[in-house]
Amino acid sequence: MAVEKTNSSSSLAEVIDRILDKGIVVDAWVRVSLVGIELLAIEARIVIASVETYLKYAEAVGLTQSAAMPA
């Protein structure tokens, strides 16, 4: 996937539209420790996309077929 560069500025609506259209994944890992003692550890993976974008990629990797079958 190539990074597209533009010289024009984008409005907030255009940025949100692009994020929902393409999707974005934020992978975070935080560790808080004091004197070598780990107090807090947080791991998170946040996916932001429109339902249409999610379903398109979920279908491509076969996630929608297993969800459609009754247990």
From Swiss-Prot:
GO terms for molecular function: structural molecule activity. Induction: Constitutively transcribed when grown in a 12 hour light/dark regime at 2000 umol photon/m(2)/s; decreased light, growth at 38 degrees Celsius or both increased transcripts up to 23-fold. It is found in: Gas vesicle shell. It comes from the Bacteria. It holds the Pfam family Gas_vesicle. One of its GO terms (cellular component) is gas vesicle shell. Its main location: other. Keywords: Gas vesicle. The keyword RNA-binding does not apply. PANTHER family: GAS VESICLE PROTEIN A1, GAS VESICLE STRUCTURAL PROTEIN 2-RELATED. Belongs to the gas vesicle GvpA family. The gas vesicle shell is 2 nm thick and consists of a single layer of this protein. It forms helical ribs nearly perpendicular to the long axis of the vesicle. Gas vesicles are hollow, gas filled proteinaceous nanostructures found in some microorganisms. During planktonic growth they allow positioning of the organism at a favorable depth for light or nutrient acquisition. GvpA forms the protein shell. This is Gas vesicle protein A. It comes from Nostoc sp. (strain PCC 7120 / SAG 25.82 / UTEX 2576).
